[in-house]
């Protein structure tokens, strides 16, 4: 009998014997003998064999396996069944056949869908790509048993097609009558079926030639390989390349359809959980103890070290990566633990770069953009299967990022309809679909990090934050923190940013050749299913800090060290396992401060805040406190955690930290009162001397024991003597150019005056009253005139006939 590859019976037996010798290595290292025993113990029927081991022991068989895969695989599978029968005979009878999967180095047979050519037909190949489509899993009949009630006989039939390893496919006609035309009944319980699925994989976009569409290839997966991967996964699939004749109108055409019969599927996607060693955990604990007081600042400064500044935003991103505690109450209510952050600001303030850093740091992160995403693309869509015509559900970005982070850039470019679709996800953490007869609920417990530009392109200082943001309150309240990032003109800060950016451009990664740039996100290709250096990576020591480099860390002699991204990733993974408990002290503090924030919001008439202060702000403070406690590896949430959370909330809501005013201790207040008392006593002494001189020149009609008269006269004399001096000084100041601080104060007061008057033009006399209302240091008319002249030169205001117009 011929077995497809020109194998006679004696050649097949010879190959089977050699493969049996390879597997039965009990006298040698016992590697595959142990693997077969593990396979029996776990009730499986597929053994994964490394081609490098076959090549080491029998080079001839390894080459034949790559070039004539059908016959060699049949021989290998029979050898495996013989070995299983010798170890456990009863287990060998449970399965029709035992399968073999391959891994290791494939050399020239390691290809992409574009490089699959006719010369590789019948060969064992390894194909890399992205899964684009998965069909439904369907049963495929392998052996059917039929019973004839008339003759009391049973009939058995085996089936094989071109997707099996058999050389000659059997007839696909399903028997319904026997030779004498007696009807047959199918015994479904005795028939044998196996799972069958079709996949399509496409070549990776970064490896496709520029300007050409990526190519794809169909994969046939059977038995235990079904549902090994889902659409979007990057995979390496090892299998036998085969062609199938395509029929058109009942006739076989000259062109063939090619498929890959898979025997091993390996995911290339990033592992969600990093690998840990005992030394790694010990280093994390030691690092936490060494920086117990400033660990939050230390880690947040090391986030995105290539971006200068943005301290509070980096702290918020660190809290977002850690998250709070999710709670599901007895009545079914879910309190989310995910932290959502929105960045709004001028162009070129590194918003997108922060998003890019989170994509590389978070264990699972999905990037999307505002214009490139629709509502169903973010949540879920109901589509029609082209093969069967059935409706099916396709998961969107937020469902794929379950327990991860979704980064949405250009959030303001999305339509209102699409933005409304994510309301449920951001608060409830799930997507509910009721379309086309499908009622489904999908989990989407993810944090949202979004970046947007203001309504007018750039932030307008003369409008309220709510007018600049231009998003609905219902959406804004679902974001825990909203940061307004402004591109302020400051010479010192601009100089620091310029130095920092230029250093980044001069910095070069170790091992990079002169004049050669690696493609973005690309590394050296390895033509094997496993990286030979992978064991070295896991065994090498975990570096806590980045190695010092003058270009990366700067020329200044600062002692600040940057924590490495690998260490931060592992630290976050360990810290997320802790579930801190809220203490009564922290709970009382949070409730008091929440009431103060609501009160401050009401007093300021909503003009200063960036987003509505609702009951969700209370949950935000609890979540941020929990995240800060996780950074400290603490099992309880204490007052210091709540204070840090309050700082972040105040900075996000009011663009400034309000708590600094309230942090004065009793000693500070006592010292302040003493200094005020001494100042008033000195002024009284000076005025009394002057008053004494005046009194000597006048009649001595004052009663020395009448203290009230004395005080009133002293105060009167003091005010009279100080008033002309102050006016004189102020007039002298008015002649000189206004100081920078005084100009800033005037601009802020002018903006407040225009907001209170609610008009675009105000008379100068009325403006003077509005500016000096409640101002401890009132502005003189000359100061106002000079400041208005300066602003008019800068095209910020226009003054005409003593009326100020806001441009």
UniProtKB/Swiss-Prot annotation:
Q: What is the residue range of the motif Arginine finger?
A: 477-480
The subcellular localization recorded is:
Nucleus; Chromosome
Q: Which GO terms describe its molecular function?
A: ATP binding; ATP hydrolysis activity; single-stranded DNA binding; single-stranded DNA helicase activity
Task: Please report the stretch or stretches of sequence annotated as the MCM domain.
Answer: 295-502
Principal location: nucleus
**Where are stretches of biased composition, namely Polar residues?**
707-723
What is the catalytic activity of this protein? Answer: ATP + H2O = ADP + phosphate + H(+)
Q: Where is this region: Disordered?
A: 664-741
Binding positions (ATP): 345-352
Domain of life from the UniProt record: Eukaryota
- The top EC class is hydrolase
Q: Name one Pfam family in it.
A: MCM_lid
Q: Which UniProt keywords apply?
A: ATP-binding, Cell cycle, Chromosome, DNA replication, DNA-binding, Helicase, Hydrolase, Nucleotide-binding, Nucleus
Signal peptide: which range, if any?
none
What GO biological process terms does the UniProt entry carry, in alphabetical order?
A: cell cycle DNA replication; DNA strand elongation involved in DNA replication; double-strand break repair via break-induced replication; mitotic DNA replication initiation; premeiotic DNA replication; regulation of DNA-templated DNA replication initiation
The record, for InterPro entries, names: AAA+_ATPase, MCM, Mcm3, MCM_CS, MCM_dom, MCM_lid, MCM_N, MCM_OB
**From start to end residue, where is composition biased (Basic and acidic residues)?**
664-673, 727-741
Record-stated family: Belongs to the MCM family.
Q: What does this protein do?
A: Acts as a component of the mcm2-7 complex (mcm complex) which is the putative replicative helicase essential for 'once per cell cycle' DNA replication initiation and elongation in eukaryotic cells. The active ATPase sites in the mcm2-7 ring are formed through the interaction surfaces of two neighboring subunits such that a critical structure of a conserved arginine finger motif is provided in trans relative to the ATP-binding site of the Walker A box of the adjacent subunit. The six ATPase active sites, however, are likely to contribute differentially to the complex helicase activity.
Quaternary state and interactors: Component of the mcm2-7 complex (RLF-M). The complex forms a toroidal hexameric ring with the proposed subunit order mcm2-mcm6-mcm4-mcm7-mcm3-mcm5. The heterodimer of mmcm3/mcm5 interacts with mcm4, mmcm6, mcm7 and weakly with mcm2. Interacts with mcm7, though this interaction may not be direct, and remains in a complex with mcm7 throughout the cell cycle. Component of the CMG helicase complex, composed of the mcm2-7 complex, the GINS complex and cdc45.
Q: What is this protein called?
A: Maternal DNA replication licensing factor mcm3
């Amino acid at each position: 009998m011929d077995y497809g590859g020109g194998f006679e019976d004696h050649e097949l037996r010879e190959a089977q014997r050699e493969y049996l010798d390879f597997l039965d290595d009990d006298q040698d290292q016992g590697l595959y003998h142990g693997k077969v025993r593990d396979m029996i113990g776990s009730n499986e029927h597929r053994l994964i064999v490394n081609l490098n081991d076959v090549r080491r022991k029998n080079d001839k068989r390894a080459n034949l396996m790559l070039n004539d895969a059908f016959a060699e695989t049949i021989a290998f599978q029979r050898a495996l069944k013989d070995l299983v029968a010798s170890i456990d005979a009863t287990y060998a009878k449970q399965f029709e056949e035992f399968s073999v999967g391959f891994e290791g180095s494939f050399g020239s047979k390691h290809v992409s869908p574009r490089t699959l050519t006719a010369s590789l037909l019948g060969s064992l190949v390894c194909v890399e790509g992205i899964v684009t489509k998965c069909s439904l899993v369907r049963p495929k009949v392998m052996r059917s048993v039929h019973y004839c009630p008339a003759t009391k006989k049973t009939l058995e039939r085996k089936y094989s097609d071109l997707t099996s390893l058999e050389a000659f496919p059997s007839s696909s006609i399903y028997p319904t009558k026997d030779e004498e035309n007696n009807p047959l009944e199918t015994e479904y319980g005795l028939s044998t079926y196996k799972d069958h699925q079709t996949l399509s994989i496409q070549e990776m976009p970064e490896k496709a030639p520029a300007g050409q569409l990526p190519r794809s290839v169909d994969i046939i997966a059977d038995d235990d390989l079904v549902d090994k991967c889902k659409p979007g996964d990057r995979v390496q699939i090892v299998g036998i390349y085969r062609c199938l004749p395509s029929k058109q109108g009942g006739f076989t055409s000259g062109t063939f359809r090619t498929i890959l019969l898979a025997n091993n599927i390996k995911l290339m996607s990033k592992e969600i959980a990093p690998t840990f060693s005992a030394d790694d955990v010990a280093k994390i604990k030691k690092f936490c103890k060494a920086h117990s007081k400033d660990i939050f600042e230390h880690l947040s400064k090391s986030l995105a070290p290539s971006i200068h500044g943005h301290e509070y935003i980096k702290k918020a991103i660190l809290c977002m990566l850690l998250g709070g505690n999710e709670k599901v109450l007895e009545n079914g209510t879910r309190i989310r633990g995910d932290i959502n952050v929105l960045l709004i600001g001028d162009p070129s303030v590194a918003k997108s770069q922060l998003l890019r850093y989170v994509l590389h740091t978070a264990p699972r992160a999905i990037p999307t953009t505002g214009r490139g995403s629709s509502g169903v693309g973010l949540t879920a869509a109901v589509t029609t299967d082209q093969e069967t015509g059935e409706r099916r559900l396709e998961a969107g970005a937020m469902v794929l990022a379950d327990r991860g982070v979704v980064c949405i850039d250009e959030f303001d470019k999305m339509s209102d309809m699409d933005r409304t679709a994510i309301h449920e996800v951001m608060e409830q953490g799930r997507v509910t679909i009721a379309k086309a007869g499908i009622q489904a609920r999908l989990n989407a417990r993810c944090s949202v990090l979004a970046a947007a530009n203001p309504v007018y392109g750039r932030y307008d200082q003369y409008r309220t934050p709510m007018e600049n943001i231009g998003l609905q309150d219902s959406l804004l309240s679902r974001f825990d923190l909203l940061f307004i990032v402004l591109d302020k003109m400051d010479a010192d800060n601009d100089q620091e940013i310029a130095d920092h950016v230029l250093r980044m451009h001069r910095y070069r990664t170790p091992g990079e050749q002169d004049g050669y740039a690696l493609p973005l996100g690309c590394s050296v290709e390895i033509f094997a299913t496993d990286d030979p250096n992978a064991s070295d990576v896991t065994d090498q020591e975990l570096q806590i800090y980045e190695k010092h480099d003058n270009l990366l860390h700067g020329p200044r002699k600062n002692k600040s060290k940057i924590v490495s991204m690998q260490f931060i990733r592992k630290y976050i993974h360990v810290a997320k396992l802790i579930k801190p408990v809220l203490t009564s002290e922290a709970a009382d503090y949070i409730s008091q401060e929440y009431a103060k924030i609501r009160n401050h919001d009401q007093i300021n008439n909503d003009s200063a805040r960036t987003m509505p202060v609702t009951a969700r702000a209370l949950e935000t403070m609890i979540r941020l406190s929990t995240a800060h406690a996780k950074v400290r590896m603490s099992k309880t949430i204490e007052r210091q955690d709540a204070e840090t959370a309050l700082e972040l909330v105040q900075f996000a809501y009011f663009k400034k930290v309000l708590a600094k005013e309230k942090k004065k201790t009793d000693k500070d207040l006592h010292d302040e009162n003493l200094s005020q008392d001494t100042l008033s006593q000195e002024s009284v002494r000076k005025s009394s001397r002057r008053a004494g001189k005046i009194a000597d020149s006048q009649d001595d009609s004052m009663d020395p024991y009448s203290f009230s008269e004395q005080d009133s006269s002293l105060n009167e004399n003091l005010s009279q003597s100080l008033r002309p001096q102050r006016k004189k000084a102020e007039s002298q100041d008015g002649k000189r150019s206004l100081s920078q601080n005084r100009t800033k104060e005037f601009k802020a007061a002018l903006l407040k005056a225009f907001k209170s008057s609610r008009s675009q033009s105000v008379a100068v006399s009325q403006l003077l009253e509005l500016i000096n209302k409640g101002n401890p240091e009132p502005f003189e008319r000359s100061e106002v005139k000079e400041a208005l002249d300066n602003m008019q030169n800068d095209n910020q205001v226009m003054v005409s006939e003593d009326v100020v117009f806001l441009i």
